[in-house]
Amino acid sequence: MATLTPRQQQIFDLIRNTIRRTGFPPTRAEIAAEFGFSSPNAAEEHLRALARKGVIELTPGASRGIRLKVSRSDSELPDQFSLPMAGVLQLTLPLVGRVAAGSPILAAEHIDRQYQVDASVFDERPDYLLRVRGLSMRDAGILDGDLLAVRRASEAANGKIVVARLGDDVTVKRLQRRGGHIELIAENPDFTNIIVEPGEEFSLEGIAVGLIRSSGF
């Protein structure tokens, strides 16, 4: 196990705790603000040091592209991307693959398999997992093939990452209400935001409450 400096351990703990609390890693700016660094570049230097020591993995170009590779605690509990251990409370959740146009998201034909996860890694209990397709949410740390933990909901606060149905399509985006309009924000500048036009068929399928990094499942 790599030896971390006290500051590196503090940053590692912040990353781990932020993921456990929100389901997503912090940005460089958030790390800098937490520790009083003069700029996000200082946070980046610490992150690169942690990556060199093999305890995290960085995704280039993604503001939240931080993945825990090991857990560092007295009891050596697994991080939130690990398979569940025996003796801990487990949830069995349906894993949703591709969603056919116009059909319910949890229709039997959409369920790839049942997936067991450690319940303790989520502050809010999810109802299902959705396999992410594409890189439109890359800068939120959500990558192609990842499993997004989703709590079913028909309403969500501004800024929440949601699973939305727009016409026959289902998409993962950040919800933003501007005046009387709804906008679905991509977390990748290569993708265009979606503006929900008045009268367009739109509904929320759920709110993201966590993430499981893809490991070939």
Swiss-Prot record:
Residues 28-48 bind DNA. Signal peptide: none annotated. It is an enzyme of class 3 (hydrolase). Keywords: Autocatalytic cleavage, DNA damage, DNA repair, DNA replication, DNA-binding, Hydrolase, Repressor, SOS response, Transcription, Transcription regulation. The keyword Repressor applies. The record marks 101-102 as: Cleavage. It catalyses: Hydrolysis of Ala-|-Gly bond in repressor LexA. SUPFAM superfamilies: LexA/Signal peptidase (SSF51306), Winged helix' DNA-binding domain (SSF46785). Gene3D superfamilies: Umud Fragment, subunit A, Winged helix-like DNA-binding domain superfamily/Winged helix DNA-binding domain. The active site is at 136 (for autocatalytic cleavage activity), 173 (for autocatalytic cleavage activity). The keyword GTP-binding does not apply. One of its GO terms (molecular function) is DNA binding. Its EC number is 3.4.21.88. Pfam families: LexA_DNA_bind, Peptidase_S24. GO terms for biological process: DNA repair; DNA replication; negative regulation of DNA-templated transcription; proteolysis; SOS response. Represses a number of genes involved in the response to DNA damage (SOS response), including recA and lexA. In the presence of single-stranded DNA, RecA interacts with LexA causing an autocatalytic cleavage which disrupts the DNA-binding part of LexA, leading to derepression of the SOS regulon and eventually DNA repair. PANTHER family: LEXA REPRESSOR, LEXA REPRESSOR-RELATED. Belongs to the peptidase S24 family. Homodimer. This is LexA repressor. The lineage of its organism: Bacteria, Pseudomonadati, Pseudomonadota, Betaproteobacteria, Burkholderiales. The gene is lexA.
